[in-house]
């Protein structure tokens, strides 16, 4: 039986990728259907109760700049906000927020249910309708068929999902949810390369059984950061601290003594896990020289007693999990309310996708999220938005769009995936972007909102606020450029008080702001340059644009040079362990692949453009640079 109305776009799955995809397609005016096995779990945080972090926060800001949902949702659900790397340069500063799971899910569902052009329907999907290598619809569990011009698959870990706790395992999409077996089998019949990955989650602890009095507190920042360019701190709920404990030798002994009961070490799990979010058993074995690991005790919400112990993801048996938890300070009497587990699932080789996230083999079929081999809510949301907007464009018979590497971390993400693929869960870091000085959190709107408007993703309210901000930035830059202070003027003493050496010649506000140690806030408190902007975002942008102008110009030159090095040959017998500055991951992959050129090296999954830059500098210093004819 066919549903009475056809749709332009169908989204299968209501996680972080699916919800962004559905919102994007609907915002662009296309009739959109979101199919989910359970409406109550739309936007659910399956693992850690947090949004953002290094590289990840950048993606959230970019999703927001394109009119997406995630930043708005976390502003209404975040119970602790921090700026990571606050003491470092603006390129690597990143926002992170602890979330109240219930508030986050509510914010997502409210947005979905109030989005025009979007219908939500609760039914698991078991099949796709494919005609002449083109997807034209989907079939649900009860045999109901929906027709559409484009379909987006955002099924997370549900495809043939298998949950492991110790040596026991069972089918599941995540704890408490069934897997998607029939759809997995159907997709395996299509001309797509499929493999298995694994991820895990820690046990959840009853907060009433933890002695917080002996633990260090970690508070959020003041003033409280805001994620969305449309948000404000007044939207945040009550703010609460996290707590810190540590594993110890007793913890590590428990783990080492029970490795034979670990599904990973017993060879039961075939899928490869995330390198940068390893299980506690992996950490203990890989970093045997460390006698402790830091564990963050993160509240799951304002109305919940559950605590997420960030850092002890595990698939060891439940009795071992209890021993691990109770071996740590403050946790001696702790009770587990949900066991930790590992989950294996199908993912599809993203090299089979176009940069728009459309399949190269099935027209109109788009993939986003963990099905593409990524890990993390933020990576999923970014892909979901891109897949949703391109599914909408496909259904309207328009060309697809994907950002370049120099435009967005989203561009880095999809280029890495579609060009190099991945053999392990892919996570975003600032180090993956060679243009990171230009791809900052603070300028995500300046980079992407205009394009979002052209694509139909950005509404009138956001567009108006964006243009007001642009005008304030430009007006203030011109004011500082044209406001001068003379070394003989009466007001110069006020200026000299903030300088390492007194002014010897006339200087503009821009000249002074470029000086080391001078901030915009200091500058506009001086009589010649007062008053300053009362818009903190615009003020930050003025300072960064002026201070980093020269660095950005130099980075552009470096980019051009790097492109000329495409055919630079690499020594055949080079041991990459000699190259200082490369990560262990990159060293292992270069030594394994032994690429013949820089160009070939740059296409190896996991070898970042930043690593290529390090390698080029090292080769030049060693006098080993050779170019092919």
Swiss-Prot record:
Residues reported in the UniProt entry to bind NAD(+): 273-287
GO CC annotation: cytosol
Cross-referenced Gene3D superfamilies: FAD/NAD(P)-binding domain (3.50.50.60), GidA associated domain, C-terminal subdomain (1.10.150.570), tRNA uridine 5-carboxymethylaminomethyl modification enzyme MnmG/GidA (1.10.10.1800)
Keyword vocabulary terms for this entry: Cytoplasm, FAD, Flavoprotein, NAD, tRNA processing
Flavoprotein keyword on record: yes
UniProt-listed InterPro entries: FAD/NAD-bd_sf (IPR036188), GIDA_C_N (IPR049312), MnmG (IPR004416), MnmG-rel (IPR002218), MnmG-rel_CS (IPR020595), MnmG_C (IPR026904), MnmG_C_subdom (IPR047001), MnmG_C_subdom_sf (IPR044920)
Cofactor list: FAD
UniProt keyword annotation of Flavoprotein present: yes
Subcellular compartments: Cytoplasm
Example GO molecular function: flavin adenine dinucleotide binding
Swiss-Prot/TrEMBL GO biological process terms: tRNA methylation; tRNA wobble uridine modification
Entry superkingdom: Bacteria
Binding site residues for FAD: 13-18, 125, 180, 370
Protein family (similarity comment): Belongs to the MnmG family.
NCBIfam families: mnmG_gidA
Self-association state and partner proteins as the record states: Homodimer. Heterotetramer of two MnmE and two MnmG subunits.
Role according to the record: NAD-binding protein involved in the addition of a carboxymethylaminomethyl (cmnm) group at the wobble position (U34) of certain tRNAs, forming tRNA-cmnm(5)s(2)U34.
Name of the protein this chain belongs to: tRNA uridine 5-carboxymethylaminomethyl modification enzyme MnmG
Gene field: mnmG
């Amino acid at each position: 039986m066919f549903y009475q109305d056809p749709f332009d776009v169908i989204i299968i799955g209501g996680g972080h990728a699916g919800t962004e995809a559905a919102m994007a397609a609907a915002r662009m005016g296309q009739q959109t259907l979101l199919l989910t096995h359970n409406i109550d779990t739309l936007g659910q945080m399956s693992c850690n109760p947090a949004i953002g972090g290094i590289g990840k926060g950048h993606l959230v800001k970019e999703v927001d700049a394109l009119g997406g949902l995630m930043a708005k949702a976390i502003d209404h659900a975040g119970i602790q906000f921090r700026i990571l790397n606050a003491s470092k340069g603006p390129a690597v500063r990143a926002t992170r927020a602890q979330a109240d799971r219930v508030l986050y899910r509510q914010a997502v569902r409210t947005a979905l249910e109030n989005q025009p052009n979007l219908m939500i329907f609760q039914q698991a999907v078991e099949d796709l309708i494919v005609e002449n290598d083109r997807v034209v619809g989907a079939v649900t569990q009860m045999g109901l068929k929906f027709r559409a011009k484009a379909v987006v698959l955002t099924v997370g870990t549900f495809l043939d999902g298998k949950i492991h706790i110790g040596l026991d395992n069972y089918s599941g999409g995540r704890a408490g949810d069934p897997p998607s077996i029939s759809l997995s089998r159907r997709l395996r019949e299509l001309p797509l390369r499929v493999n298995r990955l694994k991820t895990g989650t820690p046990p959840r602890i009853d907060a009433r059984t933890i002695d917080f009095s002996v633990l260090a507190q970690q508070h959020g920042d003041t003033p409280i950061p805001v994620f969305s360019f449309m948000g404000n701190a007044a939207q945040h709920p009550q703010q609460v601290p996290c707590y810190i404990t540590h594993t110890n030798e007793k913890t590590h002994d428990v783990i080492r003594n029970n490795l034979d009961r670990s599904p990973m070490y017993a060879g039961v799990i075939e899928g490869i896990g995330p390198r940068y979010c390893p299980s506690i058993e992996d950490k203990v074995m890989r970093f045997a020289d460390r006698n402790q690991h830091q564990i963050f005790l993160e509240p799951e919400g304002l109305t919940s007693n559950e605590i997420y112990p960030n850092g002890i993801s595990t698939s060891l048996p439940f009795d071992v999990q209890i021993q691990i938890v109770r071996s740590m300070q403050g946790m001696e009497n702790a009770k587990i309310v949900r066991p930790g587990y590992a989950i294996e699932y199908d993912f599809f080789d993203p090299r089979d996708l176009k940069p728009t996230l459309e399949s190269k083999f099935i027209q109109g079929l788009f993939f986003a999220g963990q099905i593409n081999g990524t890990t993390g809510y933020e990576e999923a949301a970014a892909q979901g938005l891109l897949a949703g907007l391109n599914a909408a464009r496909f259904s309207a018979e328009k060309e697809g769009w994907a950002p370049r590497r120099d435009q967005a971390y989203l561009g880095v993400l999809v280029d890495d995936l579609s060009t190099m693929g991945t053999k392990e869960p892919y996570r975003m870091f600032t180090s993956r972007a060679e243009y990171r000085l230009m791809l900052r959190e603070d300028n995500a709107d300046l980079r992407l909102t205009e394009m979002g408007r052209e694509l139909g993703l950005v509404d009138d309210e956001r567009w108006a606020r964006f243009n007001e901000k642009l005008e304030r930035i430009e007006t203030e830059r011109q004011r500082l450029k044209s406001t001068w202070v003379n070394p003989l003027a009466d007001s110069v003493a006020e200026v000299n008080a903030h300088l390492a050496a007194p002014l010897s010649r006339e200087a503009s506000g821009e000249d002074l702001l470029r000086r080391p140690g001078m901030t915009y806030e200091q500058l506009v408190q001086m009589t010649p340059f007062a008053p300053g902007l009362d818009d903190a975002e615009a003020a930050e942008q003025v300072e960064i644009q002026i201070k980093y102008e020269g660095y950005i110009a130099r980075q552009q030159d470096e980019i051009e040079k790097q492109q000329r090095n495409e055919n630079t040959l690499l020594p055949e017998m080079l041991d990459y362990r000699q190259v200082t500055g490369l990560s262990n991951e990159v060293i292992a992959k270069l030594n394994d692949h032994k690429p013949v050129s820089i160009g070939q090296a740059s296409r190896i999954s996991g070898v970042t453009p930043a690593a290529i830059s390090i390698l080029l500098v090292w080769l030049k210093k060693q006098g080993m640079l050779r170019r092919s004819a």
